[in-house]
């Protein structure tokens, strides 16, 4: 890619250098020898056939396990990406974590942008299952950040406690969190924080490093749902994303804490717009405006986000490809949540239920985190509208149950072909 940004350069066969030009001076340091790493792994594996290395997935319930046949494993197990990332590293989190009480997890992660190409034979069918039939081999993803297209984005606040829209973005040229070195992780932090310093007006704010916070300060931000949790999730730890914690991790937020950027958790960045109450339209308007400004500031400094027309924005987990967008609400549903039709209603509306505190938590006081299930194949505007329409349907069901009336399961939404 053209431009004075940090990138991996081949200095001589077998050696990779990190050229740091974005800071105004050139600094070079040896990162790794991915070719030798991959060669050593392949040589060791040749002592045993792929069938001897194939993981035991008989009790697993994740997308990876559904598609990783012995034949696919045999064809991919000796391949590596240019940075040395392997198939076994992709799938380890799904091998170690067979299933999840609330959702069917993906069970695999990417280590770099090239992962999705090198291991496409496994990733493509997983993506197709996870994203409601989206076929990355034949379809193209669309982006739309025009918040003026949103209709009726105001929820009844007797039910909806807070509204939030988030996405992720990855810096091209640097490995993703499961694979990044300490130097790459620190470079992500430097690039992002430098760009965010250019935000103005109601988006202006400051960056807070985890390493400079007290335990009490961290916990308060977590309890208030502003900060990501400590790296206790087995999905996170098994994928290698908790290494060196809390080095080069942090949170940036504006003065009102309504626009936030997480740095170096599951992704290089998570961009979040949130506020209490049910004004999803205002939350999405701020999200679109802030995200466009962040991307402009990143590009002005010679960097860019990982993106391609098949998969949209590239992130660590295949579940977040495309828009990377999760529009959600904290909503009280004491009656509907006890109805045995609730899971099927969510499924047909393409909505996902999480616990009050996120993916690895339970619901507290019948309050659920409800958000869009899909990220890929629909635009940001389409997904936010889907959530608005779906949440209003859930509220209508709750009201009907309050009045002693019956509810019905809506017909399933069909994936549009792009």
Swiss-Prot record:
GO BP of this protein: negative regulation of apoptotic process; negative regulation of mitochondrial outer membrane permeabilization involved in apoptotic signaling pathway; phosphocreatine biosynthetic process
Heme in keyword set: no
Localization terms from the record: Mitochondrion inner membrane
Domain Phosphagen kinase C-terminal, residue spans: 159-401
Catalytic activity from the UniProt record: creatine + ATP = N-phosphocreatine + ADP + H(+)
Modified residues (Phosphoserine): 152, 197, 233, 366
GO MF term list: ATP binding; creatine kinase activity
Residue interval of the organelle targeting sequence: 1-39
Chain segments carrying region Cardiolipin-binding: 40-64
Membrane-related topology note: Peripheral membrane protein
EC number: 2.7.3.2
Residue ranges of domain Phosphagen kinase N-terminal in the record: 46-132
Chief location: mitochondrion
GO cellular component terms given for this protein: mitochondrial inner membrane; mitochondrion; myelin sheath
Entry-linked PROSITE patterns: PHOSPHAGEN_KINASE (PS00112), PHOSPHAGEN_KINASE_C (PS51510), PHOSPHAGEN_KINASE_N (PS51509)
Annotated positions of the Phosphothreonine modification: 214, 356
Binding sites annotated in the UniProt record for ATP: 162-166, 225, 270, 326, 354-359, 369
InterPro entries assigned to the protein according to its UniProt record, in alphabetical order: ATP-guanido_PTrfase (IPR000749), ATP-guanido_PTrfase_AS (IPR022415), ATP-guanido_PTrfase_cat (IPR022414), ATP-guanido_PTrfase_N (IPR022413), ATP-guanido_PTrfase_N_sf (IPR036802), Gln_synth/guanido_kin_cat_dom (IPR014746)
Family, as annotated: Belongs to the ATP:guanido phosphotransferase family.
Subunit structure and binding partners: Exists as an octamer composed of four MTCK homodimers.
Further comment: Mitochondrial creatine kinase binds cardiolipin.
Function recorded in the entry: Reversibly catalyzes the transfer of phosphate between ATP and various phosphogens (e.g. creatine phosphate). Creatine kinase isoenzymes play a central role in energy transduction in tissues with large, fluctuating energy demands, such as skeletal muscle, heart, brain and spermatozoa.
Name recorded for this polypeptide: Creatine kinase U-type, mitochondrial
Species assigned in the record: Mus musculus (Mouse)
Gene name of the record: Ckmt1
């Amino acid at each position: 890619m053209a431009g004075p940004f940090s990138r991996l350069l081949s200095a001589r066969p077998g050696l990779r250098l990190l050229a740091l030009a974005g800071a105004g001076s050139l600094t070079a340091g040896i990162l790794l020898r991915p070719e030798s790493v991959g060669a050593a792994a392949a040589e060791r594996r040749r002592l045993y056939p792929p069938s001897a290395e194939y993981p035991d997935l008989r009790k697993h319930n994740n997308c990876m396990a559904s598609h990783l046949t012995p034949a696919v494993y045999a064809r991919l197990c000796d391949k590596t990406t240019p940075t040395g990332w392997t198939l076994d590293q992709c799938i380890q989190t799904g091998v170690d974590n067979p299933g999840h009480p609330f959702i069917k997890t993906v069970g695999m992660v990417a280590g770099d942008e090239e992962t999705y190409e090198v291991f496409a034979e496994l990733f493509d069918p997983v993506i197709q299952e996870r994203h409601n039939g989206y076929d990355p081999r034949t379809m193209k993803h669309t982006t739309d950040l025009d918040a003026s297209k949103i209709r009726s984005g105001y929820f009844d606040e007797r039910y909806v406690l807070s509204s939030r829209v988030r996405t992720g973005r990855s810096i091209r040229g640097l490995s993703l969190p499961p694979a990044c070195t300490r130097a790459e992780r620190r470079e992500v932090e430097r690039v992002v924080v430098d760009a965010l310093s250019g935000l103005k007006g109601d988006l202006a704010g400051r960056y807070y490093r985890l390493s400079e916070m007290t335990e009490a300060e961290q916990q308060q931000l977590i309890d208030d749902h502003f900060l990501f949790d400590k790296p206790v999730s087995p999905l996170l730890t098994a994928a290698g994303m908790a290494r060196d914690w809390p080095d080069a991790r942090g949170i940036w937020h504006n003065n009102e804490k309504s626009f936030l950027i997480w740095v170096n958790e599951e992704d290089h960045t998570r961009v979040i717009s949130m506020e209490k109450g049910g004004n999803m339209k205002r939350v999405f308007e701020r999200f679109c405006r802030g995200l466009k400004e962040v991307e402009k500031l990143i590009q002005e400094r010679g960097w860019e986000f990982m993106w391609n027309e098949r998969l949209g924005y590239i992130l660590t987990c295949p579940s977040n490809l495309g828009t990377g967008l999760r529009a959600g609400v904290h909503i009280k549903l004491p009656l509907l949540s006890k109805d045995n039709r609730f899971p099927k209603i969510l499924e047909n509306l393409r909505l996902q239920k999480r616990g009050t505190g996120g993916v690895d938590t339970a619901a507290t006081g019948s309050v659920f985190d409800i958000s869009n299930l899909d990220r890929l194949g629909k635009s940001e505007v389409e997904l936010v509208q889907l959530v608005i329409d779906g949440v209003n349907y859930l509220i209508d069901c709750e009201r009907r149950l309050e009045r002693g009336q019956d509810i019905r399961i809506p017909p399933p939404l069909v994936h549009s072909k792009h």
